[in-house]
């Protein structure tokens, strides 16, 4: 398949002109200043894979295309973890998830990652790319609109049938979310979709000496393995933001059943000014326990809340909160 490399061009492909015009054009950014907190890229596999078939060197080579250098890697309970300067990559039998600072041009790793999967005969049947912004993409003090235009063009080139979404108020905390869905949902396949993904983004956090927020260390990355393929990750960072922030993610079933306690524990520990909560819930996920956390954030009031119901039966919940007076 012919691939258009927009990161080597000053113009976007004609197929995406209508949408990128909303962002003010598609010129090359010069300083990569960005009014965002984090980017997230996920690939889901049609069949479970042997994570040992893809080497650390190969994954690190892909991330080098986005300007990242490998610092540390480990393997535990069926989860391979790669820590880079500003990114955290988690590889399981079902998926690859990369979370990074907005200063990383993560979209430049999209095509290389797909090419790596194809070289191992790994079929990707679902993918997403999410960025969390704390201000308007058209803010004149940043180049967010240009960077987002290139992200969208690269994603649309890689996944022509994928679609972009915006969740939340565009002039303050919101998410840009691109989704490709190629899952075969033929009833005869008897495939169950029961994943739950929970993300908590905390703005302008405070913490004790456990995290060196004011020192030379710009990024702290932690991962806890629950069981095969289930994990919790935490990034505490000052990259790409004037204030330190923390972001938490889990796909663990045990965490989903007790997520209210976990989230309130994070808020007590980091004492953020604002919080953005994201929940992606598959159609076969048992119960709605995880959604209940959105009503019970101690010490915070809702600024905005919404949900996007996808045709595949899964739901993207998003809510923003401000600390109560």
Curated annotation (Swiss-Prot):
Pfam families: SAM_decarbox
Mutant phenotype after disruption: RNAi-mediated knockdown at the bloodstream life cycle stage causes cell growth arrest followed by death. Putrescine levels are increased and the production of spermidine, glutathione, glutathionyl-spermidine and trypanothione is severely reduced. In addition, protein expression levels of ornithine carboxylase (ODC) are increased.
Domain of life per record: Eukaryota
Keywords per UniProt: Polyamine biosynthesis, Spermidine biosynthesis
Transferase is among the record's keywords: no
GO cellular component: catalytic complex; cytosol
A GO term, aspect molecular function: enzyme binding
InterPro entries reported for this sequence: AdoMetDC-like, S-AdoMet_deCO2ase_core
BP term (GO), one: spermine biosynthetic process
Pathway linked to the protein: Amine and polyamine biosynthesis; S-adenosylmethioninamine biosynthesis; S-adenosylmethioninamine from S-adenosyl-L-methionine: step 1/1
Subunit record text: Forms a heterodimer with S-adenosylmethionine decarboxylase AdoMetDC; heterodimerization is required to activate AdoMetDC.
Function statement: Probably has no catalytic activity due to the loss of several residues required for processing and catalysis. Forms a complex with S-adenosylmethionine decarboxylase AdoMetDC which is essential to activate AdoMetDC. Required for the biosynthesis of the polyamine spermidine. Required for growth and survival during the bloodstream life cycle stage.
Recorded family membership: Belongs to the eukaryotic AdoMetDC family.
Protein name as annotated: Inactive S-adenosylmethionine decarboxylase prozyme
UniProt organism field: Trypanosoma brucei brucei
């Amino acid at each position: 398949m012919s691939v258009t490399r927009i990161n080597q061009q000053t113009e976007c492909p004609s197929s995406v002109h209508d949408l990128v015009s909303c962002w003010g054009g598609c010129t090359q950014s010069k300083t990569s200043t960005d009014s965002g907190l984090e980017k997230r890229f996920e690939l889901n596999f049609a069949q479970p894979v042997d994570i040992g078939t893809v080497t650390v060197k190969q994954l690190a080579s892909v991330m080098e295309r986005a300007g990242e250098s490998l610092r540390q890697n480990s393997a535990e309970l069926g989860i391979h973890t790669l820590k880079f300067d500003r990114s955290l990559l988690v590889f399981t039998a079902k998926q690859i998830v990369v979370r990074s600072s907005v200063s990383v041009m993560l979209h430049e790793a999209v095509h290389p990652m797909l090419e790596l999967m194809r070289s191992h005969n790994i079929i990707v049947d679902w993918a997403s790319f999410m960025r969390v912004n704390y201000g308007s993409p058209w803010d004149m003090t940043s180049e967010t609109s240009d960077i987002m235009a290139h992200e969208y063009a690269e994603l649309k080139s890689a996944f022509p049938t994928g679609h972009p979404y915006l969740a939340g108020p565009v002039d303050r905390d919101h998410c840009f979310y691109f989704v490709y869905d190629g899952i075969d949902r033929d009833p005869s396949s008897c495939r169950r979709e029961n994943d739950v993904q929970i993300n908590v983004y905390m703005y302008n956090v405070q913490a004790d000496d456990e995290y060196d927020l004011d020192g030379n260390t710009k990024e702290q990355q932690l991962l806890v393995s629950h069981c095969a393929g289930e994990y919790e990750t935490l990034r505490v960072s000052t990259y790409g933001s004037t204030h330190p922030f923390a972001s938490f993610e889990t796909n663990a079933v045990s965490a989903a059943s007790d997520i209210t306690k976990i989230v309130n524990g994070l808020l007590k520990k980091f004492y953020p000014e604002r919080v953005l909560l994201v929940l992606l819930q598959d159609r076969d996920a048992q119960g709605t326990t995880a959604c209940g956390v959105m009503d019970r954030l101690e010490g915070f009031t809702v600024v905005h809340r919404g949900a996007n119901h996808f045709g595949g039966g899964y739901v993207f919940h998003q809510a923003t909160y401000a600390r109560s007076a």
